[in-house]
């Protein structure tokens, strides 16, 4: 399943990020991809050795960790270190699949269950640059407002179309979920969403308590901690 997570960063945060990223050191984006991806990748990324990068990636981690909808949809166990990319002048990233595992500075290795893109450019400021994701439900073309995030299975083939006008800037990361299976994770998210909706409409009740009990027992049964 694919999820749109709105308002991860406020407009003020986005403006501040963009101002700081204007001063960043950018390098060839192929430095963080494998042999297959390098053949179709043509973009730039912020140098991960820079002081600015360390500060910005911490802010992204804090923002996603504090977002209730992100947590409900991803049920994250481990988050990768966020990266930042930039596309301009017809730069693109052809269809590819993300690697199944990635190195992690604290955990050694992590499994990539979910991929996330946090948009940092206003969609009207550039042409092209759509994230295209192929999954079992078809093809999805994504171009979200700045500050919004899209979450999708890392097993999906995906690409970024050429940016023919303007500049597309984004942050991206990977998530190892407590729930490895996409279908089980989607069921838990649907159950959680409906429980919260019922609570907001009707308040607490024995029926809602029973559904909460079911949710946590399923999470207990399926989670890998």
Curated annotation (Swiss-Prot):
Residues 78-177 form the Fe2OG dioxygenase domain. PANTHER family: PKHD-TYPE HYDROXYLASE YBIX (PTHR41536:SF1). One of its GO terms (biological process) is DNA damage response. 2-oxoglutarate binds at residue 168. Its EC number is 1.14.11.-. Binds 1 Fe(2+) ion per subunit. This is PKHD-type hydroxylase YbiX. It comes from Escherichia coli O7:K1 (strain IAI39 / ExPEC). Fe cation binds at residues 96, 98, 158. Its cofactor is Fe(2+); L-ascorbate. It is an enzyme of class 1 (oxidoreductase). The keyword Hydrolase does not apply. One of its GO terms (molecular function) is 2-oxoglutarate-dependent dioxygenase activity. SUPFAM superfamilies: Clavaminate synthase-like. The keyword Iron applies. InterPro entries: Oxoglu/Fe-dep_dioxygenase_dom, PKHD_C, PKHD_hydroxylase, Pro_4_hyd_alph, Pro_4_hyd_alph_FE2OG_OXY. Keywords: Dioxygenase, Iron, Metal-binding, Oxidoreductase, Vitamin C.
